[in-house]
Amino acid sequence: MVLITRRRAVTTLAAALAGAVAVPTYAQAAQAAQKHSGPTRPRPLRQAHAHNDYLHERPLHDALSHGFTSVEADVFLVDGELLVAHEPAELDPTRTLRSLYLDPLLARVKANHGRVYRGYHRPVQLLIDIKTNGVAAYLELDRQLRPYRRMLSSCTYGRVRLGAVTPVISGDRSARVPMEAQRVRYAFYDGRLEDLGSSAPAAFIPLISSNWTQSFSWLGTGPFPATEREKLHTTVSTAHRNGQRVRFWATPDVAGPARDAVWSELLAARVDHLNTDDLAGLERFLRARVQ
């Protein structure tokens, strides 16, 4: 879409301008966190998920300024570092998972009495999409998460402790093997529809994600077919009975009646995360409908 293309161009240009837009230091992140922790802070939106969040002008901060409670970052393992980008051509050594997400989140948690949003006691989800080399990338990610463990949700011998931030690992499926072998984890696994009803517990797979267009033909124009609506509601209710949340990607994301129609059906079915690149658009939609 044009929106995504424009953001990619901005990201690529920023990388090429040799520091014209500097990545915030921890101190700068702390200042930003303090600035946005005052009485004008937005009310958090439980269903708002920022797809490819790092393509926005201010990764993480733009989403949080709109009240989003889930953000997505794609990562590549390059020379022992986790770099955030959508494509290999966009890799920039200054745009790391730590600098764009972990450090700013920690700064906000410290500024807001242990939470990303002051007074909001649900975790904010950090969906980390490993693009390639899942095993090695996850092992490095696990190493990087540990210094931040006091703000992170964790699973110890199958028992979950919720923190201010819950990392969920998506993307390369091979990351599952080392994750399942761990007795102590600071991240969880993003399942697929085939994981519904499997032996994997919600303590390992708290989230079920799927490509909307692979399960549903309806894209918001005309009535929602009754069989597809029933399928959607059954999928969500099954996940919720298992203690799992649901997210669909590739839903319509061009502003207009079709997108609103799909989002309305997702809300009616109690889908947990609505996926968008349009932060302001989803915020307006949810604030008009969700109390």
Locate each region found by the language model.
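Phosphate-group recognition and catalysis centered on beta-loop-alpha active-site segments
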Residues: 2-5, 9-15, 19-22, 27-291
